Amino acid sequence: MLIEQFICREDNFGVLIHDETSGYTAAIDAPESNAIQNALKRRNWTLQTIFLTHHHHDHVEALAELKQIYKAIVIGPEAEKEKISHIDQTLKPDESFLFGTHTILALSTPGHTLGALSYYFPQENLLFAGDTLFSLGCGRLFEGTPAQMLNSLKKLRQLPDETLLYCGHEYTKSNALFALTLDPYNQKLQQRAEDVFLLRAKNAMTLPVTLGQEKKNNPFLRWDNRTLRKTLRMEKETDEEVFAEIRKRKDNF
């Protein structure tokens, strides 16, 4: 499977996936029509499907135009169908389905929104997490609770280390600066942050990244880490309380 990733709007990631066997192409979300059209032209692909991670406008804004041009089928979370115009098919939480020759699991990952989905390709070890999980960060809790988001991140943390993470926004530099305030002596985090700063200085993208790296560096996947808990002075608190405190600090960072 081929993947084309690009920046659109200001900091959204656009992502196209292409099954070489069937010739099918899908977009993960629809943030900006022109950027997606240009990416399709670069690769000489035609859009058949759009997979939506959640209903926020910066992920669905281009639906009407892309449907009109390509007659693409829009597939998204059943729990958010009333909030998404132009949706054609819905997916139940944790439903599996085929894209060309590839199996996809539509993992239910509520927190950022209540119906948010993350698309996992188990054979290829690919994860498209939308705004649930970012490199060195996670999504704000616009609709869900800390408990819901923590459970979603626990689900994603169980995926194999070699899984490649793609997400909805290029937030890695600001996330790295925050992560270093909580985990300043983490050498792997220091190295990742240095790499990120160099990439962003060149206006280069910081994704994809492996989940294995994120498990070592991302504070939102390290709620049970002793060193991090000690820094927070929360050595005996529950996982949910620790996660909620990290999220609160990031909201105010």
Curated annotation (Swiss-Prot):
Tell me the Gene3D superfamilies matching this sequence: Ribonuclease Z/Hydroxyacylglutathione hydrolase-like
| Domain of life where this protein originates | Bacteria
What is this protein's record name? Hydroxyacylglutathione hydrolase
Catalytic activity annotated for this protein?
Answer: an S-(2-hydroxyacyl)glutathione + H2O = a 2-hydroxy carboxylate + glutathione + H(+)
Coiled coil, from the record? none
Its keywords, alphabetically, are: Hydrolase, Metal-binding, Zinc
Pathway per the UniProt entry: Secondary metabolite metabolism; methylglyoxal degradation; (R)-lactate from methylglyoxal: step 2/2
Ligand binding (Zn(2+) 2): 58-59, 131, 169
What this chain does, per the entry, is described as: Thiolesterase that catalyzes the hydrolysis of S-D-lactoyl-glutathione to form glutathione and D-lactic acid.
